[in-house]
Amino acid sequence: MLNESPSIEEQLARLDKMVKASRAEEGFWARHDQVRTGGPLRVKVAALPTGFAEVDELLSPLGGAFVWYPSLGLGFASGPAPDPAASVLADARGALVRRGGSLVLQAAPPEVRARIDPWGPPPPSFALLRRVKDNFDPDHRLNPGRFVGGL
């Protein structure tokens, strides 16, 4: 019976041919790049795979584009920076942090950055991060204040 069915290699070759013919990969990367570089407001989200429906709902008032990779626990959002952007981001970040996730502000207009910390709250390992930074940069000359917690 097994001899009568196509081999796994043959099935994979056919699948590969179908995917290439559909140009799905090009569309995937085009969408990914559009979201990662589009608009003055860009955020990176980390969440449990089951949490992306809520993330989508929390960030929808921003009116931008989203791309979620739930199996990776990673997502990106971008778009305009409407007036309530800082409060929407703060609410979304609070919900994510309570569930073990995070929201990092990758780009935003100055008025949004002034109202929300780009990195969010320092992690529990912050003391260790501080000691490592102090060991490698005792004079604090390398990018001072540009990382989480002002590192």
What are these regions (language model features)?
Residues M1-R23:
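A conserved active-site cap/scaffold subdomain adjacent to cofactor or substrate pockets
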